Amino acid sequence: MVYEMRTTLPLIHDEFKFGDAEQEFFEREGYYIFDRFLTDEAIEEGRSHIDRIIEQRAKGFVGTEMMAPHQLGEKWFWDIMTDPKVLDFAEKRLGPNLVLWHADLLNKEPGVGRGIHWHQDQMYWDQQQVRAPLANLWIPFDDVDEHNGTLSVLPRWHNKGLLSQATIDAADGAERTSVDEVARDGDFFGYS
């Protein structure tokens, strides 16, 4: 079953732009945060779809399980990922030949924790060691803070190349200074 999103719904704020200054910061630091990326209407619509998905799959659903909404026939999700502004961001990072390789909807219920160890996404998606460039993005549909799941990044670590998990785990605290961003629903985190 395909669930439609209103085609006239404004998805992305008009103010969103990934210009030269944003690109320069991204290249240097390995991430960029866009406040209020999604419109309030898109957040509300997305939440209603997310609530429906969780309710439909509640039987046997673990509180922190990931799902791939684009593979569930969720057109609203596909519409966000293929919005021209999102594609422009990805094209500036990767070039014109783009593939939506992987997408997750992660449900974190109140009181149900799920830690994710430090890692490089390239290790998961590039098993053939091709070193294909990646552009990751994360859009929370709820406000997040240090108590319920911020995204933590290690600035400039993308310049270290592909590291073994043992190297990442062994890095001392001084070398592994992270940026833990508090985010509002609808913000956009782009990272390498």
Positions of the model-derived regions?
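Non-heme Fe(II)-dependent double-stranded beta-helix
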Residues: 1-29, 34-129, 166
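Double-stranded beta-helix
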Residues: 6, 147-192
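Catalytic cores of transferase enzymes with a strong primary signal for eukaryotic protein kinases
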Residues: 13, 22, 59-63, 132, ...
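Short, conserved beta-strand element in jelly-roll/cupin
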Residues: 93, 119, 126-146, 182
